[in-house]
Regions:
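Positively charged, small/polar-rich N-terminal and surface patches that mediate targeting and assembly
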Residues: 1-112
């Protein structure tokens, strides 16, 4: 089992969710985050003054999936979230040692 964590642009959430649902991914966690990558933010003009915006609003999506699905999940996220512009985001994959569904006590893949 793996956790696939993606940092994406907020307006891409629905497309990413639809792509994951089409793969049979039933649950995901979405967190509003701020950050920057290679672009290191940008500047904005407000009332004639220029301001540096260092941290950009993003969404962090986390999904727990069977190891066999990781490649398909990554492809689905990239396809749905990609704009071709700076700041499209990143995807990270980490192992899950164990998973437990609190309500039923199901473990590991049965819990997903």
């Amino acid at each position: 089992m793996k956790i696939v964590m993606a940092i994406i642009k907020p307006f891409k959430l629905e497309e990413v969710r639809d792509a994951l649902t089409a793969l049979g991914v039933h649950g995901l966690t979405v967190t509003e985050v701020k950050g920057y990558g290679r672009q290191k933010g940008h500047t904005e003009i407000y009332r004639g003054a220029e301001y540096a915006v260092s941290f950009l609003p993003k969404l962090k999506i986390e999904v727990a999936v069977a190891t066999e699905l990781v490649g398909q999940v990554i492809e689905a996220i990239v396809s749905a979230a990609k704009t071709g512009q700076i700041g499209d985001g990143m995807i990270f994959v980490t192992p899950i040692e164990t998973a437990v569904r609190i309500r039923t006590g199901e473990k590991d893949l049965d819990a997903l």
